[in-house]
Every structure is written in structure tokens, then in C-alpha cells.
Regions:
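Acidic catalytic loop of the alpha/beta-hydrolase fold
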Residues: 182-185, 247-250
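Short beta-strand/loop motif that positions the catalytic acidic residue
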Residues: 176-178, 182
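Short, solvent-exposed loop/turn and secondary-structure capping segments
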Residues: 61-66, 91-93, 144-145, 166-170, ...
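A domain-start/cap signature at the N-terminus of enzymes
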Residues: 4-49, 75, 79, 104, ...
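Primarily recognizes the serine-hydrolase "nucleophile elbow" in alpha/beta-hydrolase
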Residues: 65, 120-172, 183
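Gly/Ser-rich "nucleophile elbow"/oxyanion-hole loop immediately N-terminal to the catalytic nucleophile
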Residues: 41-46, 92-137
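Short, proline-enriched alpha-helix->beta-strand connector loops that line the catalytic pocket
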Residues: 169-174, 234-238
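Short substrate-entry loop that stabilizes the transition state in hydrolases
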Residues: 43-90, 152, 158, 164-165, ...
Length: 267
């Protein structure tokens, strides 16, 4: 797992849109919602924005310190948002997932839409280069965002699946990174060791290849990592990275690979 320097606690963070990490609170549906924002020094005009969604039991602070996005943003010159889920989880609109947000009917799609809009109003972000990614429940949430919004140029899920019924999906580039030995969100689909019971990673990949009107995928294998990449209409792409024997985890290569995929998408 990628590790980074631990950021400051929420209480000591500035609330303005400053260089470095800041903390922001917005009202969504009568509920105060919070997100962290990392803004690197020397940010160009019209910078990309990556929205990183934590897993169940995770948090915005944990996601910022665990996955190496801030360090990559320094070199890639993009902004990273880390929304905080209610009760450390996300309501993904399906599959009984997950936790308190699902039980209380929290509208996390509305929250993330509002957080992105807040950032676009206050930071020089290119609205055509906004991306969502997440781990586990956060990865599932990234699919829910792809199914229910049109604001993302690409999404990338790690150890996730698609639980939203996704009746009216928007064409969007999609990458899934998933291990074949994942017991919580099984690569082959079906009932996991906890509550997740969803489609297989190849089936989700096929769904989005169909949505995006993709050609036949090209497949390459390097040791225990197999990459399937399909080119699609309007230069979008749909990719599945399969880790033979990989578990329910964020691989060391995931952050860099996701950013390379995002940066290559049309906008």
C-alpha cells in the first residue's frame, strides 16, 4: 500500500482555499458535510481535479495520508479533494451498501456534486478534467457517480464493483484495478465475506465498454498483472487491471496508474 506523510488534523487546518491542505464544510440537504482539499504550489490555470473517496472505516484524513495522491499532485500539478463519508461510509444507491449512510438515505451523489461545484467556484479547475477514484466502498461510489452525473471525464475504482442499477449511464472512461483473491468484493462477483454481492470485475468492464461503444480490448500481461484496455468512441477508454492473487488492497502502482489513465482521457 502506498504511504504518504500524515497531514495535519482537521482542527488545525485552514478553511480557505490555500496552498497545501485545507478543510471545507458545506450544507447539503440540511446536513453539514466536510471535505479536505490539497492544492499544490505553483498550480496552473485550469488545473485537473481528482476526487478520492475513502473505503468503509476510512476517512478523508486517512485517504490523504494513505494513497500518495498529494505527492503525485505536487509533480502533476493537479488538485485533490478528499470528501468525508457520514459514519465513514458511502451510500452507493444499491446492494444495501453501506452502513449508516445507506440506512439513513444520505444523498452522497448530491454531496460530491456540491463539493466539486464548491471547488470549481473557488479554485482554477478545468471543469472538463475532473476525475473520481476510490477504494472499496469508495470505488463502488465512483461507479455510482458515473451512473448518476455527467461531471467526470473518467473514474477509477480499486477493489470495487457496481451496485447502482445504472439505468441511464453517461459515457465516461473507466478503470478498475482488482485482485483475484479479494474476499470482501470478489473479483468473480457474487457474495463477498461481508455485505457486498455484486457483478464480477469483467462484467462491469463489459458494461462500460458497451456504454462507451468500445472496440475489442487489447490484453497484456506482466508477471501477475494483466491489463485489458479498450479504445472507445470520442477517444474514451475502458480498462481492467487484474492482479493474480491480489487481495482487498490498494496496490503500490495504483495511484500512478490511475493518474496516467485520467491524464490521457479527452476533455
Amino acid at each position: 500500500m502506498v504511504a504518504g506523510c500524515s497531514p495535519a488534523d482537521n482542527e488545525s487546518l485552514p478553511s480557505g482555499f490555500v496552498t497545501g491542505t485545507s478543510i471545507h464544510s458545506i450544507n447539503v440537504g440540511g446536513r453539514a458535510r466536510v471535505y479536505r482539499l490539497y492544492r499544490p504550489a505553483g498550480l496552473p490555470v485550469s488545473a485537473p481535479l481528482v476526487v478520492m473517496l475513502h473505503a468503509v472505516t476510512g476517512s478523508a484524513e486517512q485517504a490523504e495520508s494513505s494513497y500518495g495522491w498529494d505527492e503525485l499532485a505536487d509533480s502533476g500539478r493537479f488538485v485533490v479533494a478528499y470528501p468525508d463519508g457520514v459514519g465513514r461510509a458511502w451510500n452507493v444507491n444499491g446492494g444495501g451498501c453501506c452502513g449508516r449512510p445507506q440506512r439513513e438515505g444520505v444523498d452522497d451523489v448530491a454531496f460530491i456534486r456540491a463539493a466539486v461545484a464548491d471547488i470549481v467556484r473557488n479554485v482554477s479547475v478545468d471543469a472538463s478534467r475532473i476525475y473520481a477514484t476510490g477504494m472499496s466502498n469508495g470505488g463502488i461510489m465512483s461507479y455510482t457517480l458515473a451512473c448518476n452525473t455527467g461531471i467526470f471525464a473518467a473514474i477509477g475504482s480499486v477493489a470495487g464493483t457496481q451496485l447502482d442499477s445504472c439505468r441511464s449511464p453517461h459515457p465516461v472512461s473507466v478503470m478498475e484495478i482488482h485482485g483475484t483473491s479479494d474476499k470482501l468484493v470478489p473479483y468473480g462477483g457474487g457474495q463477498g465475506s461481508n455485505i457486498i454481492n455484486g457483478p464480477s470485475a469483467p462484467d462491469v468492464n463489459a458494461f462500460w465498454r458497451n456504454v462507451n461503444q468500445c472496440g475489442a480490448p487489447s490484453v497484456t500481461t506482466d508477471s501477475d498483472v494483466t491489463t485489458s484496455t479498450a479504445g472507445c468512441v470520442d477517444n474514451r477508454g475502458v480498462a481492467l487491471i487484474t492482479i493474480d492473487g491480489g487481495g482487498h488492497e490498494w496496490p503500490d502502482f495504483a495511484t500512478q496508474t490511475l493518474w496516467q489513465f485520467f491524464a490521457a482521457q479527452p476533455h
